[in-house]
Design a protein with these regions (language model features):
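Short linear motifs in intrinsically disordered/low-complexity regions
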Residues: 9-10, 18-21, 58
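Structural motif
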Residues: 7-10, 39-43
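Phosphate-binding loop of NTP-binding sites
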Residues: 29-35, 41, 45-179
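Glycine/alanine-rich phosphate-binding loops at beta-alpha junctions
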Residues: 5, 25-29, 38
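A diffuse structural propensity rather than consistent per-protein peaks
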Residues: 12, 25-27, 63
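Conserved beta-strand segments of alpha/beta enzyme cores
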Residues: 3, 20-22, 60, 102
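Glycine-rich, highly charged phosphate/nucleotide-binding loops
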Residues: 16-32
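NAD(P)-binding Rossmann-fold cofactor-contacting core
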Residues: 2-16
Length: 180
Protein backbone atom coordinates (compact mmCIF):
# COMPACT_ATOMS: atom_id res chain seq x y z
CA UNK A 1 0.00 0.00 0.00
CA UNK A 2 1.45 3.34 -1.06
CA UNK A 3 1.80 6.24 1.32
CA UNK A 4 1.18 9.52 -0.46
CA UNK A 5 2.25 12.87 0.96
CA UNK A 6 1.58 16.38 -0.31
CA UNK A 7 3.78 19.41 -0.02
CA UNK A 8 3.15 22.98 -1.02
CA UNK A 9 5.21 26.09 -0.28
CA UNK A 10 2.19 27.57 1.45
CA UNK A 11 0.19 24.78 3.09
CA UNK A 12 -1.92 27.16 5.18
CA UNK A 13 -2.97 29.24 2.17
CA UNK A 14 -3.85 26.13 0.11
CA UNK A 15 -5.33 23.88 2.79
CA UNK A 16 -6.17 26.14 5.74
CA UNK A 17 -5.52 24.89 9.24
CA UNK A 18 -6.91 21.44 8.52
CA UNK A 19 -4.84 18.80 10.21
CA UNK A 20 -3.91 16.02 7.82
CA UNK A 21 -1.11 13.50 8.23
CA UNK A 22 -0.57 13.49 4.46
CA UNK A 23 0.23 17.23 4.30
CA UNK A 24 3.89 17.80 5.12
CA UNK A 25 5.78 21.00 5.82
CA UNK A 26 9.25 21.82 4.54
CA UNK A 27 10.97 20.56 7.71
CA UNK A 28 9.28 17.14 7.52
CA UNK A 29 9.93 16.30 3.86
CA UNK A 30 13.71 15.60 4.10
CA UNK A 31 13.09 13.16 6.97
CA UNK A 32 10.85 10.89 4.88
CA UNK A 33 12.27 8.13 2.68
CA UNK A 34 10.52 8.35 -0.69
CA UNK A 35 10.45 5.72 -3.43
CA UNK A 36 9.13 8.25 -5.95
CA UNK A 37 8.63 12.00 -6.03
CA UNK A 38 6.15 13.49 -8.49
CA UNK A 39 6.90 17.13 -9.15
CA UNK A 40 4.51 19.60 -10.75
CA UNK A 41 5.94 20.91 -14.06
CA UNK A 42 5.89 24.47 -12.72
CA UNK A 43 8.36 23.62 -9.95
CA UNK A 44 11.94 24.57 -10.73
CA UNK A 45 13.82 21.84 -8.88
CA UNK A 46 16.96 24.00 -8.75
CA UNK A 47 15.26 27.07 -7.25
CA UNK A 48 12.39 25.87 -5.06
CA UNK A 49 12.44 25.67 -1.26
CA UNK A 50 13.19 21.94 -1.42
CA UNK A 51 15.93 22.22 -4.06
CA UNK A 52 18.66 20.64 -1.91
CA UNK A 53 16.43 17.65 -1.12
CA UNK A 54 15.22 17.30 -4.73
CA UNK A 55 18.74 17.50 -6.18
CA UNK A 56 19.81 14.74 -3.80
CA UNK A 57 16.82 12.62 -4.90
CA UNK A 58 16.83 13.51 -8.61
CA UNK A 59 16.69 9.85 -9.70
CA UNK A 60 13.38 9.49 -7.85
CA UNK A 61 11.71 12.46 -9.55
CA UNK A 62 8.91 11.74 -12.01
CA UNK A 63 6.49 14.02 -13.85
CA UNK A 64 2.80 14.03 -14.68
CA UNK A 65 3.80 12.70 -18.11
CA UNK A 66 5.49 9.70 -16.49
CA UNK A 67 2.42 8.88 -14.40
CA UNK A 68 0.23 9.18 -17.51
CA UNK A 69 2.55 6.93 -19.52
CA UNK A 70 2.50 4.21 -16.86
CA UNK A 71 -1.24 3.80 -17.57
CA UNK A 72 -1.58 4.71 -21.26
CA UNK A 73 1.43 3.46 -23.19
CA UNK A 74 1.30 3.99 -26.97
CA UNK A 75 -1.90 6.03 -26.76
CA UNK A 76 -0.53 9.47 -27.62
CA UNK A 77 0.76 11.90 -30.16
CA UNK A 78 3.03 14.44 -28.50
CA UNK A 79 3.88 17.88 -29.83
CA UNK A 80 6.67 20.05 -28.46
CA UNK A 81 8.76 22.95 -29.73
CA UNK A 82 9.27 26.61 -28.97
CA UNK A 83 6.45 28.02 -31.07
CA UNK A 84 3.30 26.54 -32.60
CA UNK A 85 2.71 23.71 -30.11
CA UNK A 86 -0.81 24.77 -29.16
CA UNK A 87 -1.93 25.51 -32.71
CA UNK A 88 -0.53 22.24 -34.05
CA UNK A 89 -2.00 20.22 -31.17
CA UNK A 90 -5.43 21.86 -31.64
CA UNK A 91 -5.46 21.21 -35.40
CA UNK A 92 -4.38 17.60 -34.93
CA UNK A 93 -7.04 17.10 -32.25
CA UNK A 94 -9.72 18.55 -34.56
CA UNK A 95 -8.67 16.33 -37.47
CA UNK A 96 -8.75 13.18 -35.33
CA UNK A 97 -12.03 14.16 -33.67
CA UNK A 98 -13.62 14.86 -37.07
CA UNK A 99 -12.68 11.29 -38.04
CA UNK A 100 -14.73 10.06 -35.05
CA UNK A 101 -11.78 9.15 -32.86
CA UNK A 102 -12.16 9.48 -29.09
CA UNK A 103 -9.37 11.99 -28.90
CA UNK A 104 -8.38 14.18 -25.94
CA UNK A 105 -6.31 17.36 -26.08
CA UNK A 106 -4.15 17.47 -22.93
CA UNK A 107 -0.95 18.71 -21.39
CA UNK A 108 0.54 22.16 -21.35
CA UNK A 109 -2.41 23.42 -23.40
CA UNK A 110 -4.39 23.82 -20.19
CA UNK A 111 -6.11 20.46 -19.84
CA UNK A 112 -4.09 18.62 -17.17
CA UNK A 113 -3.07 15.22 -18.46
CA UNK A 114 -4.03 13.46 -15.22
CA UNK A 115 -7.55 14.93 -15.01
CA UNK A 116 -9.10 13.08 -17.95
CA UNK A 117 -12.06 10.83 -17.17
CA UNK A 118 -14.01 8.10 -18.99
CA UNK A 119 -10.95 6.81 -20.80
CA UNK A 120 -11.48 3.67 -22.87
CA UNK A 121 -9.19 1.37 -24.84
CA UNK A 122 -10.04 3.49 -27.90
CA UNK A 123 -9.13 6.83 -26.33
CA UNK A 124 -6.16 8.58 -27.94
CA UNK A 125 -4.37 11.64 -26.60
CA UNK A 126 -2.84 14.64 -28.32
CA UNK A 127 -0.33 15.92 -25.78
CA UNK A 128 1.20 19.38 -25.85
CA UNK A 129 4.43 18.94 -23.86
CA UNK A 130 6.48 21.82 -22.53
CA UNK A 131 10.19 21.75 -21.79
CA UNK A 132 9.23 22.01 -18.10
CA UNK A 133 7.26 18.76 -18.33
CA UNK A 134 9.90 16.95 -20.35
CA UNK A 135 12.90 18.14 -18.32
CA UNK A 136 12.56 15.61 -15.48
CA UNK A 137 10.59 12.97 -17.32
CA UNK A 138 12.13 9.51 -16.99
CA UNK A 139 9.52 7.18 -18.47
CA UNK A 140 7.34 9.10 -20.89
CA UNK A 141 7.47 8.28 -24.54
CA UNK A 142 4.90 8.72 -27.24
CA UNK A 143 3.83 6.54 -30.15
CA UNK A 144 4.08 9.60 -32.38
CA UNK A 145 6.20 12.65 -31.56
CA UNK A 146 6.99 15.97 -33.18
CA UNK A 147 9.50 18.64 -32.25
CA UNK A 148 8.31 21.59 -34.31
CA UNK A 149 11.15 24.04 -33.85
CA UNK A 150 13.63 25.25 -31.26
CA UNK A 151 14.79 28.76 -30.53
CA UNK A 152 16.09 30.32 -27.29
CA UNK A 153 13.29 30.33 -24.71
CA UNK A 154 12.86 29.68 -20.99
CA UNK A 155 16.58 30.24 -20.45
CA UNK A 156 15.79 31.54 -16.94
CA UNK A 157 14.55 28.03 -16.12
CA UNK A 158 17.01 25.89 -18.11
CA UNK A 159 20.01 28.22 -17.60
CA UNK A 160 21.25 27.85 -21.19
CA UNK A 161 20.14 26.87 -24.69
CA UNK A 162 21.85 23.47 -24.51
CA UNK A 163 19.77 22.46 -21.46
CA UNK A 164 16.59 23.76 -23.11
CA UNK A 165 17.28 21.71 -26.26
CA UNK A 166 18.11 18.68 -24.14
CA UNK A 167 14.76 18.97 -22.33
CA UNK A 168 12.90 19.07 -25.65
CA UNK A 169 14.78 16.08 -27.04
CA UNK A 170 13.96 13.95 -23.99
CA UNK A 171 10.75 13.30 -25.91
CA UNK A 172 12.72 11.19 -28.38
CA UNK A 173 15.16 9.56 -25.95
CA UNK A 174 13.10 6.49 -25.19
CA UNK A 175 11.15 6.06 -28.42
CA UNK A 176 11.13 2.58 -29.90
CA UNK A 177 11.91 1.77 -33.53
CA UNK A 178 8.18 1.41 -34.19
CA UNK A 179 7.49 4.96 -33.01
CA UNK A 180 7.36 7.91 -35.35
Amino acid sequence: KAKVYLFDDNLTKKFGNRSNQRLKNIQEIPKIKFDSIIVSPGIDVLKCKLSKFLKKNKSKIYTDLDVFYSFYKNKSITITGTNGKSTTAKILHEVLSDQMYDCRLVGNIGNPILCEKKITNNTFFVVEASSYQLDYSQLFTSKFSAILNISPDHIERHRNLKNYISAKFRLLDSQSRESI
